[in-house]
């Protein structure tokens, strides 16, 4: 993942990382991560920071080394690219460009994608995403749905990976579900 970064980006990240590596041991504490990221123009929420820390600090020792930090920043930058993709996707759905996706617009795009949905299915999709209850989907609601779907896919991929690793570590023998839970 970090191999997708330019030399300039790596230098910038190294400089920011070094500012917070107080004793020069090549590690920063997880508490300092938020400060480093804000100094690089990122603005993660506390929940996002905790997710990042959980992803990066695999051994739970409370420190993050520079290679782990580079991977984190590369992922974060990829997510920024994804934000642009989300904006473009929203524009595709929002045919009249009024800032909302109506049931008619959703039905039209889904039909063009080859998804023949009933009125009830379209209404259900709108209801699931429509947090403020106005009968249409604004950009924030759209992002929440899309990000929830992305998280769901990542969780499923992680589960498949863990299950695959468990099966391999058990010499191909089937692992009972309750044993799998014990392992996890």
Curated annotation (Swiss-Prot):
Gene3D superfamilies per record: EF-hand
Residues the entry annotates as binding Ca(2+) 2: 57, 59, 61, 63, 68
Region (Disordered): 156-184
Function: Calmodulin mediates the control of a large number of enzymes, ion channels and other proteins by Ca(2+). Among the enzymes to be stimulated by the calmodulin-Ca(2+) complex are a number of protein kinases and phosphatases.
Binding site for Ca(2+) 3: 94, 96, 98, 105
SMART domains xrefs: EFh (SM00054)
GO cellular component, one term: myosin II complex
GO function term, MF aspect, one: calcium ion binding
EF-hand domain mapped to chain residues: 8-43, 44-79, 81-116, 117-152
Superkingdom of this protein's organism: Eukaryota
Stated name of the protein: Calmodulin-related protein
Something else known: This protein has four functional calcium-binding sites.
Record: residues binding Ca(2+) 1: 21, 23, 25, 27, 32
Biased composition annotated in UniProt, kind: Low complexity: 161-170
Source taxonomy: Eukaryota, Viridiplantae, Streptophyta, Embryophyta, Tracheophyta
PROSITE patterns (alphabetical): EF_HAND_1, EF_HAND_2
